């Protein structure tokens, strides 16, 4: 009996993912604090050979009570949420740690918080979940892939989005909270930020009465290359905050 052909020898190193890393600076636009640094975020996005992608982010808000958040959020090859981890401290004290898992017809959460203790949640979904808000600024731009760019100026609605916290700073929980989302595509623009100059897409998150406190209008710019990398954000109203990509490092396989 003939011997089976030997399997081809694979190289010892396997580097078939592509990665990008960056820093988002948080500043104030209030007149009495104009351009004062009020926080920062360090993120990394890895896209694997099978098309799945994961964002890890460390987020810091210095405004009292300070917020520190660490997240790990993954999508499948079709940009559908699969799972997320969120750990949260407020005022330098532990608030909660939670793990979220998304199925085709329900979402679940296992969390431990300083207020509620150990909590298990299950939330039914009418359709598979399209997007999840974990409050990392880098991930805000990932919602925008759902918006039709052939309808500029029109309010478009994402019927269901789950949050890890309904608080504007994401400073509660983490636990599941369901809302819809209203977004306008403003249009393509050329944009220069601290990290460089980009072909960008401009969107605006508009009024949403489903939150316990209505969020002010939020403008977001992201890359126009299909990766939806966050470039800049501006929140109006009582918040008057600014978010800007100031550092960007692409791995060797990411592309230009």
Task: Describe each PLM feature range.
Residues 2-113, 158-256:
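Acidic, serine/threonine-rich low-complexity disordered tracts
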């Amino acid at each position: 009996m003939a011997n089976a052909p030997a399997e081809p020898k694979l190289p010892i190193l396997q580097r078939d993912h592509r990665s990008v890393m960056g820093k988002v600076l948080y500043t104030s636009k209030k007149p009495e604090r104009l351009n004062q640094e009020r926080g920062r975020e360090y993120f990394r996005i890895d896209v694997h050979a099978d098309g799945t992608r994961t964002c890890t982010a460390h987020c810091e808000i210095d405004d009292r009570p300070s917020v520190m958040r660490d997240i790990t959020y993954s999508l499948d090859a079709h940009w559908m949420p699969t799972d997320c981890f969120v750990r949260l401290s407020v005022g330098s004290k532990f608030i909660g740690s939670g793990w979220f898992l998304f199925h085709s017809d329900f979402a679940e959460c296992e969390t431990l918080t300083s207020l509620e203790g150990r909590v298990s949640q299950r939330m039914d979904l009418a359709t598979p979940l399209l997007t999840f808000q974990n409050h990392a600024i880098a991930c805000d731009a990932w919602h925008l892939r759902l918006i039709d760019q052939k309808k500029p100026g029109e309010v478009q609605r994402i019927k269901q989005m789950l949050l890890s916290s309904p608080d504007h700073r994401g400073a509660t929980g983490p636990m599941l909270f369901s809302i819809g989302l209203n977004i306008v595509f403003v249009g393509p623009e050329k944009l220069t930020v601290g990290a460089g100059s980009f072909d960008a897409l401009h969107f605006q998150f508009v009024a949403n009465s489903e939150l316990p406190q209505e969020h002010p209008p939020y403008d977001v710019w992201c890359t126009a290359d299909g990766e939806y990398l966050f470039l800049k954000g501006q929140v109006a109203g009582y918040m008057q905050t600014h978010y800007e990509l100031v550092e960007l490092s692409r791995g060797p396989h990411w592309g230009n």
